[in-house]
Curated annotation (Swiss-Prot):
Pfam families for the chain: ABC2_membrane (PF01061), ABC2_membrane_7 (PF19055), ABC_tran (PF00005), ABC_trans_N (PF14510), PDR_CDR (PF06422)
Protein name (record): ABC multidrug transporter MDR3
Catalytic activity: itraconazole(in) + ATP + H2O = itraconazole(out) + ADP + phosphate + H(+); voriconazole(in) + ATP + H2O = voriconazole(out) + ADP + phosphate + H(+); fluconazole(in) + ATP + H2O = fluconazole(out) + ADP + phosphate + H(+); (2R,4S)-ketoconazole(in) + ATP + H2O = (2R,4S)-ketoconazole(out) + ADP + phosphate + H(+)
Segments forming domain ABC transporter: 153-408, 850-1093
Activity regulation, short description: Azole transport activity is inhibited by milbemycin oxime.
Topology of this chain in the membrane: Multi-pass membrane protein
Annotated Polar residues bias: 824-833
Length: 1503
């Protein structure tokens, strides 16, 4: 940081001469308004910034160059120049918080100031030139779907490939690319999906995960090599992906403030602090992108309410802008924005490039002409080939000269991309045989062109002007160095110093906590509740030997609760990982800075939880009540919490996928619990697993807690042997305390002796253990911090199709065998042209007319009624394609939902009729609704998804064969033959965007809708060619008798010509126009022109012209109230007359047989169930990750437990160990439960969002099938779980003396099956009514903890406070433990181990039998030396039944307990169905108030 950077200096003066004023604001007017004034906030004001500085310097670079070239004379300006950062109030146009703010003037002013001091503000620009750029990857164009049967084979193939024993298939993605984009220029990248647009951007920006550059690539950034730019100057060339990754809990203002502060330079304008800089830059960018009104709104995501999707996209744009990179690659960043906001975004880029010299490379879909005209250059890609690069204006002429024709009113961008589509390009007459046909031919024509020769000449000249490692590199380095904090190293790509990064990340961490306190509060409240419950169970422990086991149990439970308090941090870290990796690529901060800051930010919450939990536990249970011992207890507990937090963070950081983190973690946690030293003492551990205890931090903590509690302490004996009648006068060495460590004749037992005899613990180990725990803490802290810097998340694969095994198409197999790069490329296959008859002829022609009149829709917002739709009229007739258009927020989708009977709240009034009759229960299943989101079951193939819809939604009277045959017709009609057997999958591994949209349409057509088809934004987010293909498909459907109503967002003129009628809505849901469009939309244009609108230019897009006419386009205004004009027009009178005519005539017409079915569903419930159950089984079979994870949980932990307690002896400790083996088996429960929930949620989401509204099948069929599908897998997995657990432990040996080995083995097998069935049905019950799997998992975990505490293992029912006995009886695990333990060890003699034998002296003159015989008759036990007279050896428990009675287990009740467990399973099933009905099934027909407008009547129902 420069010494003067914080000093207040005189503001520079000077102004531009009038004749030299930059006038670009006239060309690109980019001004925003802000409804919120940003005052000085309590942000940290330390040395933290660079992101915004980079941007300012970018601006400075351009102007200083202009000034040197004579473009600006800023040295001799007499008038004072305002510093916008300090004095913007004096000029509203420079104040981002003012409605008059002008971005162009602001930029000009900043550059005017910075250009006066080129030494303080050295400029930095980065154009890019590239030649011989070839990029390839490895993989296949198709893959076969994994399922339970073929996963091992697939895994083996993967291992072979990793070892290099199987040759990879090379896929060429980009071939021989060359280009030049100078600083200050904008390049638009055009091409169809799969043509390589994203790869081009990723390569230029250094995002090359999974990509490989060929030898000989020549990519230079204005004198800087590709390698040097992406190593030493990371963040100077950045890639902005399509996806939005932000912290949802943070406000928009804080999100952007963070980005501004992280890149705030050291060489800011004089007198401007980092805080002032960051706040002002944030306000400027928010104003520029019309985000000012969202400054205090949370960003949100799909689960957390926040800003809209379009606003979230603009936040990503703002964040990238604030990074201030001289070269920015934008990958489809306008996706999700309407055309107005997309245009504003591109204009803002133009301003940045013009004034600051930045370079923008933008891949954009559906670019309107106004957007395209802003760009300087264009590049056109065709399946990995470059077929044009050059001047954007020249591009159109280049292809016309080649022989292609551009239709009137087609935008240049659409024309250029249509050239790459054989079915859409138009050839001029006479050129049919002369134009290129294949991508290679296009590329060859480009290489032979004069345009390419000129380009290569320009590249040569450019590279000579900026030679590698020349003066430009030094300037670039000097510019970056000027921005960096003084303590930042020269080679670092980051602007801030490391401590500044940590401080800034801590600020953000606390803002995130403040934005969502629910997790912290839930954790504190949950821990208070759990501590109170546990403390009450172990309440006020007596200082006698009776408390030995319960004190151990308590400390065991306490240390586990402390240790695993941070286990969910794995999920938290994974959710934020994409954000941190993105910011690292932007060079905002080190990932390790975020790692350290997150530890520090979490510390107060951890400390609060630890204090509350441990205070309650310690003092309510009467643990050793001295200050010193409490603080030792707290110190070890809290240190263990921190250590285990680092352990879980390290696991998350070193894993490249979430499953890599979660599966080992569950087994890892099980190992830590078992080898803590309580469930199996150190001396009893088997040698092959004993090493685990040495690397287990919890084991050291538990030992120290036990030493802290028992060391140097005497416990009064609670029970003597012998005692009772006849032994009242026994004293001295003739009696002994019934506890380990007891000495004959001594009334107390030493805590130290007890620890030594039972656990092999020694007091000298306590502080040694603390040192070991701290060492673990430091080691895992180092691993965590190092891993965050070195390990990145696994990138997604390239776009490939996936097929079931054996169904990969022949053409893809051939490409794989021949290793033909072009055949194997990720190209998008064209729809197959079908020969013969038109496949759409198979569509059933619709005959009904759907018409509506005076439709209004009102909802209540903050107790005030708001009208969303206002007296909308219209109709849809068979064979017509009707467009529903309007400005953003006009209510287009809402009208579609109201008409389709899909709204769930509010008041709907008006008439909606089918052939003059009211809609009935069957209306929803008789209509098709193509939703905007393409929601399908990922594991289904295209054909299966279509068949599922046809089987369930076509009438029951239609034969099965006819339904299946119709599906084949739909596949041919939609051109889906090549991928009919392809799996839906996910984007990247499955269908691409267009294929998904076609499937969404196909699913609705396969249902043979009797009435009409609704389409909601079918072209949103698609490229122009895909949008065109979807519109032509809708046109084809309409031409064959379908009635189609489609919402569409500002389409091109070409798309609009496909529609017959238009319903146009203004804001507030008011009608602006309803009627015919006419040829070339002449009818529509005539209507508006006749009502006073300006003439529509011949080359204009009527859709955009119409928006300008009504004042809805950016910058447009109108004095005409167009909804009022429509309301009073003759056209509306004619619409009303025709509606009345339809109502009277059609109501008299008899209904066709297909329309007389009034049932809610097409199929009976039992058929629904069979079809849905079949799909559910199919889903599980094709989800090998889930099944094999489930199998791992059934095999690995049980095997681990089995060999941990291998061949346990029938001693007192052995029986207790066997009881703990059962206890450990139950710990699998939460993992099994949480594992199932996400799969249920996926199915339920699909059902509730798409299948339930369309009345595909009943919720009853869905719930029953989702519960039943688990049963066969549970039965199958019972086999390995039984053998891996039952036999290694040696339960079968206990049954040998009773001759009941077979019976007991069968009973144990049944009990394990019951356990697995209980787990799955309990999971179904918990998640049935809950939205998120995480919430369900937390509830299940809480229930599990309670049932585990009260099942009688850790605390016997006799030691339990009377209040909690009801929980003991309520816990299902009580009956499971009872049944398993009695089956496993019942009716067996106990053989005491040497350290369990009690030794005492008999009374004088008596043998041991004579002395202890009476005692054994009423108290039990076995005399091992009956004839001895000097020393008796006595085993306190003779048989296992006596041991079982001590924990309230009776052998003869095991079958009763099994019956009770079946009752719990049945309860879970009924509960799952009941909770789903209660919480998620709409209770009334429509869930809305409905009424008929003329009568103004509404039947009220609650949503």
């Amino acid at each position: 940081m420069a010494p003067t950077e914080e000093a207040n200096v005189t503001k520079p003066t000077g102004e531009l001469r009038p004749d030299e004023k930059l006038n670009y604001e006239e060309d690109v007017k980019c001004s925003g308004s802000s409804s919120t004034t940003v005052g000085k906030t309590a942000y940290d004001t330390d040395d933290i910034s660079q992101s915004q500085a980079a941007e300012l310097q970018d601006l400075a670079r351009q102007l200083s160059r202009a000034s040197r070239q004579g473009g600006l004379d800023v040295e001799n300006e007499p008038q004072q120049v305002i510093n916008p950062f300090l004095d913007s109030e004096s000029d509203p146009e420079l104040n981002p918080d003012s409605k008059s703010f002008n971005v162009a003037k602001w930029l000009k002013t900043i550059l005017q100031i910075t250009s006066r001091d080129p030494e303080r503000f050295p400029k930095r620009t980065a154009g890019v030139s590239f030649r011989n750029m070839n990029v390839h990857g490895y993989g296949t164009a198709a893959d076969y779907q994994s399922d339970v049967g073929n996963l091992p084979l697939k895994a083996w193939s993967g291992i072979m490939s990793m070892l290099g024993l199987r040759k990879k298939v090379r896929i060429d993605i980009l071939r021989d690319f060359e280009g030049l984009v100078k600083s200050g220029e904008m390049l638009v990248v055009l091409g169809r999906p799969g043509s390589g647009c994203s790869t081009l951007l990723r390569t230029l920006s250094g995002e090359t995960h999974g990509l490989y550059l060929d030898e000989g690539n020549d990519i230079q950034y204005q004198g800087i090599s590709w390698e040097q730019m992406h190593k030493n100057f990371r963040g100077e060339v950045i890639y902005q992906a399509e996806t939005e990754t932000h912290f949802p809990q943070m406000t928009v203002g804080d999100t952007l403030y963070f980005a501004a502060r992280a890149r705030a330079p050291a060489n800011r304008l004089p007198g401007v602090s980092r805080e002032q800089y960051a706040i002002h830059m944030r306000s400027m960018v928010m104003s520029m992108l019309s985000l000012s009104h969202t400054i205090n709104t949370q960003v949100g995501n799909e689960y957390i309410r926040g800003v809209s999707g379009g606003e979230r996209k603009r936040i990503s744009i703002a964040e990238t802008t604030l990074s201030g990179s001289p070269l920015q690659c934008w990958d489809n960043s306008t996706r999700g924005l309407d055309s107005a906001n997309a245009l504003e975004f591109v204009k803002s880029l133009r301003l940045s490039t013009k004034y600051s010299g930045t370079t923008a490379i933008v891949a954009i879909y559906q670019a309107g002409q106004a957007i395209y005209d802003i760009f300087d250059k264009a590049v056109v890609l065709y399946e990995g080939h470059q077929i044009y690069f050059g001047n954007a204006v020249r591009a159109k002429e280049y292809f016309i000269e080649m022989g292609f024709d551009c239709p009137s009113r087609q935008t240049t961008a659409d024309f250029l991309t249509s050239v790459t589509s054989p079915s859409e390009r138009r050839v001029r007459p006479g050129y049919e045989s002369r134009v290129p046909q294949t991508p290679a031919e296009f590329a060859q024509r480009w290489k032979e062109s004069e345009d390419r020769r000129i380009l290569m000449q320009e590249i040569d000249e450019y590279n000579k002007t900026y030679p590698l490692h020349g003066e430009q590199l030094q300037k670039f380095q000097a510019s970056r160095l000027a921005e960096k904090s003084r303590s930042t190293s020269k080679s670092s790509p980051y602007t801030l110093s490391y401590p500044m990064e940590i401080k800034l990340c801590m600020w953000r961490g606390f803002q995130r906590l403040k934005g969502d306190m629910s997790m912290t509060l839930t954790s504190i409240i949950g821990n208070i509740a759990m501590s109170l419950i546990i403390a009450s169970v172990f309440y006020n422990q007596q200082e006698t030997t009776d408390s030995f086991f319960s004190r151990g149990s308590l400390l065991f439970f306490a240390i586990l609760m402390n240790a695993f308090a941070s286990s969910l941090e794995i999920l938290t870290l994974w959710h934020q990982r994409p954000i941190v990796e993105k910011h690292d690529k932007y060079a905002l901060y080190h990932p390790s800075s975020e790692a350290i800051s997150s530890i520090l930010v979490d510390m107060p919450a951890k400390l609060a939880v630890a204090i509350v939990f441990n205070l309650i536990i310690y003092f309510m249970t009467n643990l050793r009540r001295t200050p010193g011992h409490f603080f030792i207890f707290f110190l070890f507990s809290f240190t263990t919490t921190l250590t285990m937090s680092n352990v879980f963070r390290s696991i998350a950081a070193v894993s490249r996928t979430l499953s890599q983190a979660l599966v080992p973690t569950s087994i890892f946690m099980l190992a830590l619990v078992i080898y803590t030293g309580f469930t199996i003492p150190v001396r009893d551990m088997r040698p092959w697993f004993k090493w685990i205890s040495y690397i287990n931090p919890i084991q050291y903590a538990f030992e120290s807690l036990m030493i802290n509690e028992f060391h140097d302490r005497e416990f009064k004996c609670a029970v003597y042997i012998p005692s009772g009648p006849g032994y009242s006068n026994v004293s001295g060495t003739s009696k002994i305390c019934a506890a380990k460590g007891a000495m004959a004749g001594k009334p107390t037992v030493s805590g130290d002796v007890f620890l030594r005899e039972t656990y092999s613990y020694y007091a000298s180990h306590m502080w040694r253990n603390y040192g070991i725990i701290v060492a673990f803490f430091l080691f895992f802290l180092f691993v965590y911090i190092t891993a965050t810097e070195l390990v990145s998340a696994k990138p997604s694969k390239g776009e490939i199709l996936v097929f079931p095994k054996g169904k990969v198409p022949a053409f893809l197999k051939q490409s794989k065998k021949k290793q033909d790069p072009e055949a194997a490329s990720t190209q998008e296959k064209q729809p197959v042209e079908t020969s013969g008859h038109d496949q759409t002829a198979a569509i059933v022609k619709q005959t009904s007319v759907f018409h509506w009149e005076s439709v209004c829709y009102d909802i209540k917002i903050k107790k005030e009624s708001r009208r969303i739709l206002d007296n909308v009229d219209g109709w849809v007739k068979p064979g017509t394609l009707t467009a529903l258009m309007g400005v953003s927020g006009a209510g287009k989708t809402t009208l579609l939902d109201v008409l389709a009977n899909r709204v769930t709240m509010g008041v709907v009034t008006g008439e909606m009729l089918v052939d003059g009759r009211l809609r009935d229960d069957s209306f929803q299943r008789k209509t098709g609704y193509v939703q905007q989101q393409d929601l399908h079951l990922e594991i289904s193939t295209v054909r299966e998804a279509l068949t599922f819809s046809a089987l369930l939604r076509q009438p029951n009277t239609t034969p099965y064969e006819e339904k299946v045959a119709y599906v084949e017709e739909v596949i041919k009609m939609l051109g889906m033959e090549e991928y009919a057997n392809a799996v839906v999958g996910v984007l990247g591994e499955g269908l691409n965007v267009e294929q998904r949209k076609r499937l969404t349409i196909g699913v609705e057509i396969a249902a043979k809708p009797d009435l009409l088809l609704f389409f909601d934004e079918p072209t949103s987010g698609l490229d122009s060619q895909t949008a065109w293909s979807i519109c032509t498909l809708m046109r084809k459907l309409a031409d064959h008798g379908q009635a189609v109503l489609c919402t569409i967002h500002q389409p091109s003129a070409m798309l609009m010509q496909e529609f017959d009628r238009l319903l146009f809505l203004a804001s507030g849901g008011r009608t602006v126009y309803f009627g015919e469009l006419g040829k070339h939309m002449s009818t529509l244009i005539e209507y508006f022109e006749s009502k006073g609108a300006p003439k529509c230019p011949p080359d204009a897009n009527p859709a955009e012209w119409m928006l300008e006419v009504i004042g809805a386009a950016p910058g447009s205004k109108t004095d005409i109230d167009w909804p009022a004009v429509w309301r009073d027009s003759a056209e509306r009178v004619e619409v009303r007359r025709h509606l009345a005519e339809l109502k009277s005539e059609l109501s008299q017409k008899p209904q066709t047989p297909r329309l007389t079915g009034y049932g809610e569903f097409a199929m009976p419930l039992w058929k629904q169930y069979l079809i849905v159950q079949h799909r559910m089984f199919q889903q599980y079979w094709r989800s090998p990750d889930y099944i094999y994870s489930k199998a791992c949980l059934a095999i690995v932990p049980t095997l681990f437990i089995g060999f941990t307690f291998y061949k346990e002896q029938v001693s007192l400790q052995g029986i207790q160990n066997q009881m703990f083996a059962i206890f450990m088996f139950m710990i699998l429960f939460p993992n099994l439960v949480q594992q199932m929930m996400p799969y249920f949620v996926i199915q339920r989401s699909l059902y509730e969002v798409r299948e339930r509204p369309s009345k595909t099948y009943s919720w009853i069929a869905f719930m029953i099938s989702s519960v039943v599908v688990e049963i066969p897998w549970n039965a199958l997995l019972t086999v390995p779980a039984f053998f891996c657990w039952y036999y290694p432990i040696g339960f079968y040996k206990n049954a040998i003396p009773t001759d009941a080995v077979t019976e007991r083995s069968g009973t144990m097998f049944l009990l394990i099956l019951i356990f697995l069935m209980f787990s799955s049905t309990f999971s179904s019950m918990v998640i049935a009514g809950i939205e998120q799997a995480e919430t369900g998992g937390n509830i299940a975990q809480l229930c599990f903890s309670l049932t585990l505490v009260f099942c009688g293992v850790l605390v016997s029912p006799t030691a339990m406070p009377g209040f909690w006995i009801f929980m003991y009886r309520l816990s299902p695990f009580t009956y499971f433990v009872s049944a398993v333990l009695s089956t496993g060890v019942g009716r067996t003699d106990i053989v005491c181990a040497a350290n369990e034998i009690l030794r005492l002296t008999p009374a004088a003159g008596q043998t041991c039998m004579e002395y202890l015989g009476p005692y054994t008759k009423f108290a039990g036990g076995r005399i091992l030396t009956p004839d001895a007279t000097d020393m008796c050896e006595f085993c306190a428990v003779a048989d296992t039944d006596t041991f079982l009675k001590g924990v309230n287990i009776i052998f003869d009740e095991r079958w009763r307990n099994i019956g009770i467990l079946f009752g719990y399973i049945a309860f879970n099933m009924v509960g799952a169905i009941g909770l789903y009905w209660l919480l998620r099934v709409p209770k009334r027909k429509s869930g809305v108030k409905q009424g008929q407008q003329p009568q103004k009547q509404a039947n009220e129902t609650k949503a």
